[in-house]
Amino acid sequence: KALRAPEHKLTVTGVRELAPYTELTVHCPSLLGANTAILPPTAWARMWIQQGGRQHQRAYTLTRINREHATAIILVLHHEPSGPASRWAKRVKPGATVSVQMMGGTSYRPPSPGDRMLLVGDQASAPALADAVAASPTSSPATVVMLAPEAGFLPLAARDHRLIRVNPEVSEEKLLAAVDRTLWADTGDLALDWVFI
């Protein structure tokens, strides 16, 4: 907060458990309303969680923004050991408020129609990847390589795309090999137009 970026108050209006996530519906006219600057896909906010007499900063993607109703969805991933944001999300109730700042998090270059897209990430970045695919032209073939278990909820874009889940226990080398195999199988080369990692 020392950098004095504009601060907004998000009001939690809905809470839903989608293990391993908690889905929060938030309302904020000053950030998400029809008269505010349009946030690009994958935009993320710095959330300030009050806990143990301190404020802890965590960044979360604002997805499915509805400017008419000034709402968005935030997915908080739970893992062990749990951190301040995870503990807060597990007990938060509708009506609670939390401070956020937009300081960075809005750089985004959209793909052009027909661009071949590759997106690589894990469960923490899954909301941003889903947001990027959903906002892309339907003529752009998209492949998502996700470091995530085969079972369990994973946020996905509604539009047609290819999803490859890779066991989180594998090494980075095996993950990269899986990406290479996928591209060679699809195209016979490694040419890509747009990459999001």
Can you describe what each PLM-predicted range is?
Residues 3, 9-90:
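Ferredoxin-reductase
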